[in-house]
């Protein structure tokens, strides 16, 4: 790939053209930034800015992934432990309880025994069903726009996690937009790049609205007015940037503000969700164990009496 770029440069092509010929190997934002800097003679500064930009966006992305995946991992571990107990621990007590015909066995114990028996019979079908569901879900998410939009809408309206997604999207939008404007990329081109960069269909629609507004001679900010997915403070800062002619600077301030909110939201998730899930795991395992063990102690106490 790099040899082809070197060859393109020796044949008289510009650096941006050489990168563009590599297809999707290089992000569109990088290519357009370089294209603009070639006209202004600021290529070294632009490359330094891009290095910082991609480092910051990668850090934000990792924080976002951590916030969304960490609770899921803890929940999967909890379900795995519970399933293991049901499949390999509880069955060892079944024969004992079968000898207790007529004994007063608590309802919760009977429920645990019934659930254990159900899992032993159908665990393979349950696992196949889960895998099948995940495959169908991923296929629809990748290939059906309306389904993807619906899932993203649902996640963004979920307590706690919704704000994390919104803060992340606003941060990425503002940071990218500010960087494009600061390097003299045209607003319409900037919006088209933002559309390609974003993976959120709801924000893509906002960007499309902004492009249409620009074509009609309207301001960019009107596309973000009264939109639940775009916080009011961010909208007001865009309006201020348009009125003062300092839109790049204001977008940087928006990015910095919502990046801090995003970091705080991720920290809160780690702080509150972890103990809640640990308590859930403890309660689940405790209920299963006590429902099996306590009746046995009662039985032995009755025999000794």
Predicted regions: what is each one?
Residues 1-5:
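Conserved small/polar residues in nucleotide/adenosyl-binding loops
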Residues 36, 42-236, 240, 246-305:
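Low-polarity contexts
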Residues 7-10:
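Alpha-helical, low-charge segments enriched in small hydrophobic residues
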């Amino acid at each position: 790939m790099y040899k082809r770029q070197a060859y393109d440069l020796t044949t008289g092509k510009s650096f941006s053209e050489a990168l563009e010929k590599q297809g999707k190997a290089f992000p569109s934002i990088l290519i357009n930034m370089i294209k603009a800097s070639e006209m202004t003679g600021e290529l070294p500064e632009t490359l330094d800015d891009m290095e910082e930009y991609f480092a910051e966006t990668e850090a934000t992305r990792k924080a976002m992934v951590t916030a969304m995946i960490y609770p899921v991992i803890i929940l999967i571990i909890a379900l795995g432990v519970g399933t293991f107990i049901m499949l390999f621990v509880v069955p060892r007590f079944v024969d004992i309880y079968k000898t207790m015909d007529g004994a007063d066995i608590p309802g919760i114990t009977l429920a645990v025994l019934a659930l254990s028996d159900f899992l032993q019979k159908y665990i393979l079908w349950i696992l196949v069903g889960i895998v099948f569901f995940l495959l169908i879900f991923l296929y629809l998410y990748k290939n059906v726009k309306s389904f993807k939009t619906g899932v993203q809408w649902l996640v963004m309206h979920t307590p706690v996690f919704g704000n994390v997604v919104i803060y992340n999207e606003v941060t990425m939008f503002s940071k990218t937009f500010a960087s494009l404007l600061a390097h003299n990329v045209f607003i319409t081109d900037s919006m088209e790049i933002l559309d390609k960069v974003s993976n959120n269909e709801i924000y893509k629609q906002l960007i499309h609205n902004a492009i249409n507004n620009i074509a009609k001679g309207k301001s960019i900010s009107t596309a973000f007015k009264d939109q639940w997915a775009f916080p009011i403070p961010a909208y007001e800062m865009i309006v201020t940037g348009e009125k003062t002619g300092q839109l790049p600077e204001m977008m940087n301030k928006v990015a910095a503000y919502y990046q801090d909110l995003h970091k705080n939201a991720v920290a809160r998730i780690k702080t509150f969700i972890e103990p809640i899930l640990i308590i859930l795991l403890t309660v689940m395992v405790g209920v299963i164990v006590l429902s099996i063990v306590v009746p046995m102690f009662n039985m032995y106490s009755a025999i000794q009496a």
